[in-house]
Amino acid sequence: MNKPFDKLKLHGFNNLTKSLSFSIYDICYAKTEQQRKEYIEYIDEQYSADRLTDILGEVVDIIGANILNVARQDYEPQGASVTILVSEEPVEEQQNYDADEAPGPLPDSVVAHLDKSHICVHTYPEAHPDDGICTFRADIEVSTCGIISPLKALNFLIHSLESDVVTIDYRVRGFTRDINGVKHYIDHAISSIQNFMTEDTKEAYQMMDVNVYQENLFHTKMMLKETDLNTYLFGLSTDDLSDEEEEEIRSKLTREMQEIFYGRNLPDLD
């Protein structure tokens, strides 16, 4: 972990823009066409615009901001999107700002304060036409202009959504000046996005970093280590499957997760 930054005395407003973008994937197996249809309907209801608004509202609470406007929409045949504009906090409340490179809070605590932000989410349910694999993706972006890193909301979002594979990008852009006129291109310590995650999260996932430190650009990929096949089955359980079927389904799920994690199609081994 890097040494924490000393607090900067700024000339005017903090003009740094910090953006957290990540895609969360939930993967399952549905054996029949009817089960795949029911999975899409389940996901569409589970992650409706109303529920996503509630989740993002919790994010706003975590970062200590105020909602200015909410735009939300459910789509046909499936999918939803929500965008929230957030107001800045009074200057006197910013004195409790925590810049440490450490995990952010879960939804039962509020520890950070925000200057300006927008938060948005889009969902993409889909199913393979004939091999039973179904994948739900949620794209989320939290962008702030000010002193607070949106990484403080990361833990809550990972725990709020069913996350089998996660890809995360964090970047800091622009600069802010101190009282001597010196430009600063980042105002907090960070060596890895992983340092903003709790230990239970790090233990549950296989992770890989690709960071470009000189560009203030950080990237982390996560893949769940879960081995219980029942957690990936929709509308059936392992009791309904033969040993051969279990092995085949497990192979399909593993392949799907690895292809998403590595961002490329794997060659057939047959």
From Swiss-Prot:
UniProt keywords, alphabetically: Autocatalytic cleavage, Decarboxylase, Lyase, Polyamine biosynthesis, Pyruvate, S-adenosyl-L-methionine, Schiff base, Spermidine biosynthesis, Zymogen
Essential cofactor(s): pyruvate
PTM per Swiss-Prot/TrEMBL: Is synthesized initially as an inactive proenzyme. Formation of the active enzyme involves a self-maturation process in which the active site pyruvoyl group is generated from an internal serine residue via an autocatalytic post-translational modification. Two non-identical subunits are generated from the proenzyme in this reaction, and the pyruvate is formed at the N-terminus of the alpha chain, which is derived from the carboxyl end of the proenzyme.
Pfam families per UniProt: AdoMet_dc (PF02675)
Residues carrying the site annotation Cleavage (non-hydrolytic): K116, S117
Organism: Pseudoalteromonas translucida (strain TAC 125)
Documented EC number(s): 4.1.1.50
Record's keyword annotation contains Ribosomal protein: no
Its job: Catalyzes the decarboxylation of S-adenosylmethionine to S-adenosylmethioninamine (dcAdoMet), the propylamine donor required for the synthesis of the polyamines spermine and spermidine from the diamine putrescine.
Cofactor note: Binds 1 pyruvoyl group covalently per subunit.
Gene Ontology cellular-component terms listed: cytosol
Gene: speD
KW Lyase (keyword) present: yes
Active-site residues, record numbering mapped to chain: S117 (schiff-base intermediate with substrate), H122 (proton acceptor), C145 (proton donor)
Full protein name: S-adenosylmethionine decarboxylase proenzyme
Subunit and interaction comment: Heterooctamer of four alpha and four beta chains arranged as a tetramer of alpha/beta heterodimers.
